[in-house]
Amino acid sequence: MTVASSNTTADEFLSGKLLIKQPRNGYRAGIDPVLLAASVNAKAKQTVLELGCGVGVASLCLGYRVPDLHLTGLEIQPALAQLAMENAQYNNIQMDVVTGDLAVLPQGLKSCQFDHVIANPPYF
């Protein structure tokens, strides 16, 4: 992963345990997704769906804390979904990222069941 570009920054989360590439402008992840991840009582082997995963911070923080989760992120913006995939790969955390709209759930997710479903809606 290229650490940063003119359009992105590389930011540390969990005291530097995760390096996350995110857009330089617009919504930027901060402490909220970290706290969201900390609030999920997930256990190894469970499944987690993050709605509107953005660049993947909440899921990746959760995946770091609880190894061996099956993480899936749903993101409507293709550029953010791509960054989420890159962030998962760079941080060695298995995460499937689906580009799609919650209002029109992608076919592959319609038949899935999850132990936990999380969301961290942005606010401005």
Name each model feature, range by range.
Residues 39-124:
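Conserved SAM/SAH cofactor-binding pocket of Class I
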